[in-house]
Amino acid sequence: MLKDKKILITSGRTKENIDPIRYLSNNSSGKMGYCLAQAAIDLGGEVTLISGPTNLEIPKGLKNFISVESALEMYERVNEFFEDTDIFIACAAVADYRPKEYKKEKIKKSDSDLIIELVRNPDILFEMGKKKDNQLLVGFAAETNDIKENALKKLEKKNLDIIVANNASTMGTDSNTVEIIKKDKSSVEIKQKNKMELAYDIFSEVISVLKKGKNE
């Protein structure tokens, strides 16, 4: 199945600190990424999991777990492992922006509005798509509208082999409905399965792409 394959997975959310008390983040639980890591281990893969903050237990049998907090930290660690990776699955909910300036002391409340200037974080998957050699890249598109249309745009723009499209409202839940879309635009819709089952379904498509590549 995935024997001798090196699989790099990102999961969880990122935290972008504003001051020692406040930060920017999102509602991602990290469940999907952790389920993917567990499925990859069960299928014989050599897995590295780079995770932002979660409340989850580390997958059984995982040998390489890397904890990060910010998007920049995650970007640096992905860069570190990407070259020696066969399959990269970007499942983390990474902040698009971070505060331009971190305040070392708590920002005090005042009578005026607080304006925080934000700057863009690196687009990890886009950057890896540019660096891609023989790696198979899998991305996720959590959208609120025009789900498939937006997923197809990401698939092409980020040079992906597979994208998993779903409704952003399912973030943090135990189950999901997704559409798995391949580079050739063929797709499989999977309705309302728990995330562990979905993880195996996603790897089924990954394995089919790997097999197709060998036969070409």
Regions found by a protein language model. Give the residues of each.
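A cross-family phosphate/adenosyl-ligand binding-site feature
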Residues: 1-216
